[in-house]
Each structure stands twice: as C-alpha cells, then as structure tokens.
Amino acid sequence: MSKTLFDKVWDSHVVRKIEDGPDVFFIDRHFIHEVTSPVAFLGLKSRGVNVLYPERTFATADHNTPTINQHLPVQDPLSANQLQALEDNANEYGISHWGLGHQKNGIVHVVGPENGITLPGATIVCGDSHTSTHGAFGAIAFGIGTSEVEMVLSTQCIMQPKPKKMRINVNGKLSKGVGPKDVALYIIAQLTTSGGTGYFVEYAGDVFENMTMEGRMTVCNLSIEMGARGGMIAPDQTTFDFLEGRLYAPKGEAWTKAVEYWKTLKTDADAVFDAELNIKAEDIEPMITYGTNPGMGIGITKHIPSAKEVEGGEETYKKSLAYMGFNEDDVMIGKQIDYVFLGSCTNGRIEDFRAFAEIVKGRKKAENVTAWLVPGSHVVEAQIKEEGILDILTEAGFVLRQPGCSACLAMNDDKVPAGKYAVSTSNRNFEGRQGPGSRTLLASPIMAAAAAVTGKLTDPRELF
C-alpha cells in the first residue's frame, strides 16, 4: 500500500491503536524549557514517578531569559524561579540542561537542529506551539500541553489521534527579495489561520527542494499558524549535509545506515492526500502582515483589503484594523515604524542574520527605529562574529543582543510600547503579543532590514 511521508513516520511509532480512540504514540525526542515544564515535574513528584528515558529529553532556558547581561542574576522573580526549577529538575532526573551561559544554550527549536538532536523520521514534542519547526528534517514534530509533557516524561508516549494529510506544492522560481518567510506568510494568507485545522502538512515542490535547511525550518515553524498540527519536508541531500558531523547525529557505520533509511522517507508516487494546494512561486512577493493574526498578510505593494474581500466577520476584521491603526484600502509602503525585531525560532538563525546584513551593509539604522537583533543561540552568535556580520551591524548602528526568545512573546524586558509599530521576524502578531498595546507587522529578515534603515515600510527589492 502506498504511503505518504507522514504515514511512514507516524505508523512506525504507533505502540498501540485504540479502537475509536487515539493512538498510543512513541516519542523519540522531547524538548523542555522553563515555562511549561515546572508543573509537569511537580506532577511526577506528586505521583512518585521517575522520568522513563532521561536521555531522550533535552532542556534549555529560552522563553523568559534576558537578552542583555546574562552573566548577572535574573532580576524578575518569576523568571528566576522558573529558570532555577528547570535546572533543579534536570539535575534531579539526569536530563541534559543548557542554561544561561552554557555554550549550547539558545531557543529550543534552534539548538535542537544545530546539535543534531533533530533527525529525519523522528517523533519530536515540546511544550511549545512552534515545535513544528523540526518537521523541516522529515520528522513529525508538534507542540503539547503541560499535562502531556508530564505524560511523555513518565512514559515516553503520548495519546494522539492521527491527523488528516495535506500537501502544499510550491513550484517555479521565487523572485529576488522573496524568501522562505514570504512563502509561509503567503500560504497562510491563502489558507487562512484555520485552513489547516485537523491536518498535518507536507510541503513539496521545487521551491522547498531548493531551500536551505534554515529556510525549511522557517516554513515548517509557521505551519501551526494556518491551524495545522504540524508540517514536514522530505529529507534529502541538503538535510544530510546539514546533519553530518553534528554532536548528536549518528557517526561512522551508524551514519551510513541512518542515511540509507532516511532516503526511504518520501511520499510514494501514488499516495493519496486528504487535501492538496498548488501555488506558483511567481505569485509570491515580499509579504507583510497588517492585522492581528498571521493570515492577515499581503504583498508589500498591495492595498489592505476591504472587509468584504476577506473571510470572517466584518466586525472582527474592522476591530483588528482599528487596533493596528489602519484602514481598508491603505497602502503599506511608506508607513512609519518604530521597532524592528530580528530573531525568534522562526528567523533567528545564521542565514537570517546574513540576509539582514546584506541589506544594512553600507547603510545606517534610521534614527526613529529601535532595533533588537537577537540570535537564536550562542552557536549563531559565534557565527555572526566569525563571519564578520557583527562588524557590518555595528558599523550600521545596530547592537547584537544575547540569545533567547526575546520580543517574540515579550516574557522578558524586550517589550514594544503601546501604540508602537514593530516589524518583526517572529511568528505571531496577536494583540499585545510583543507587549500590551503593541502593533506587530510580521515580515522576513530582508523586509525587517529595509524598514530598519529607512524607518518605514519599504519594498526591500528597491535596496538590492
């Protein structure tokens, strides 16, 4: 029987099928952080239960960590307590822990791949929505709640109904200035934030085949924003080249055998999907969001649609525009902005900083812009320095901060003030997401760079 990539990975991890119920599903890799894990560990302790496979769980501090002066004690009491709890729990149960200052520390969905923990054909969970990032490697990866974190810690399994399957094909050649973030935002704009509900998505077509692993991670990261359970891309030579030699990746003969198996992880020619979407790469231009969900995105040269042109309630749509201070039929180009955020598990990798630096090189940060440039990990931070990118950023008037989730969800001090506009390379533009009253415009690193040096929304293609 022909199978999709998703079927092959899912079916190989089902421990038991429950009639008219969810599957008992084995988890290969489990990532935890300081926010969603403390209560799960309290549950274990209250039941007198141990962590079944501590070597399959990895802990990193990221969500509410400061991005300056990380060598000093964390000032916020709640954050300090959560960070200490993560360290204590990891030590007690024998779990690898990369806290503040550790050379491997960083955002969970950045450090997993860069250390070779994320592998093709694996099942991966974390108490975080954007766990779908790891699907870029041909893994099944999705976010879970705190009670499920406890379940995985104690049993290494989870109860999960099998989602339906959707394939999104993007073929053709992307225009200059259009990158993975634009592709993802375009897809979400087409499907809406609920169009993927109930599905696990496979991204296919030559656009994804030609993407780097960093680009694929950006796309899979945003799968959850169309309502999907997750997204994945079949592993290929690009995947293998990225993983070879990384710390937790197989070595020697084990590597050879692993690659041999990974090459089988692709959808069979006559496999059937429950839904399919076809997109022409040439239709995608640099994207920008204008509302309060990631599906409210348009090409930078387009006008904001009228309420009658979009799905959903007219009252809700107008409320969203009012929150953003925009009107129907507004042109986005030329709108002044106040903040720029480069970072997050969506766009905090070395490729994103290279793209940003390419635009700002030889230019200066606009005086009206406050910029937060936050690498996704210490490894990325080191690469920025080694490649001379830091020199370019410094010359242009930018300051590099220390790794963490930062302004993506503003759990630390990196908060956008009320009423201010932030061009952000993160993944969510909900009301107050980056601080109470903040106004978020989701964009690619290139778009963010263009805004940072001009002080307003600018078509980045004009700066090449």
UniProtKB/Swiss-Prot annotation:
Catalysed reactions, semicolon-separated: (2R,3S)-3-isopropylmalate = (2S)-2-isopropylmalate
Residues noted as binding [4Fe-4S] cluster in the record, renumbered to the chain: C345, C405, C408
Biological process annotations from GO: L-leucine biosynthetic process
This protein's pathway: Amino-acid biosynthesis; L-leucine biosynthesis; L-leucine from 3-methyl-2-oxobutanoate: step 2/4
One Pfam family matching this protein: Aconitase
Keywords: 4Fe-4S, Amino-acid biosynthesis, Branched-chain amino acid biosynthesis, Iron, Iron-sulfur, Leucine biosynthesis, Lyase, Metal-binding
SUPFAM superfamilies for the chain: Aconitase iron-sulfur domain (SSF53732)
Domain of life: Bacteria
Reported cofactor(s): [4Fe-4S] cluster
Keyword Oxidoreductase in record: no
Note describing how the cofactor binds: Binds 1 [4Fe-4S] cluster per subunit.
CDD domains membership: IPMI
Endoplasmic reticulum keyword on record: no
Disulfide bonds: none
GO MF, one example: 3-isopropylmalate dehydratase activity
The protein's Enzyme Commission number: 4.2.1.33
Similarity-based family: Belongs to the aconitase/IPM isomerase family. LeuC type 1 subfamily.
Self-association and partners: Heterodimer of LeuC and LeuD.
Classification via NCBIfam families: leuC, PRK05478.1, PRK12466.1
Job of this protein: Catalyzes the isomerization between 2-isopropylmalate and 3-isopropylmalate, via the formation of 2-isopropylmaleate.
Name under which the protein is recorded: 3-isopropylmalate dehydratase large subunit
Organism in which the protein naturally occurs: Flavobacterium johnsoniae (strain ATCC 17061 / DSM 2064 / JCM 8514 / BCRC 14874 / CCUG 350202 / NBRC 14942 / NCIMB 11054 / UW101)
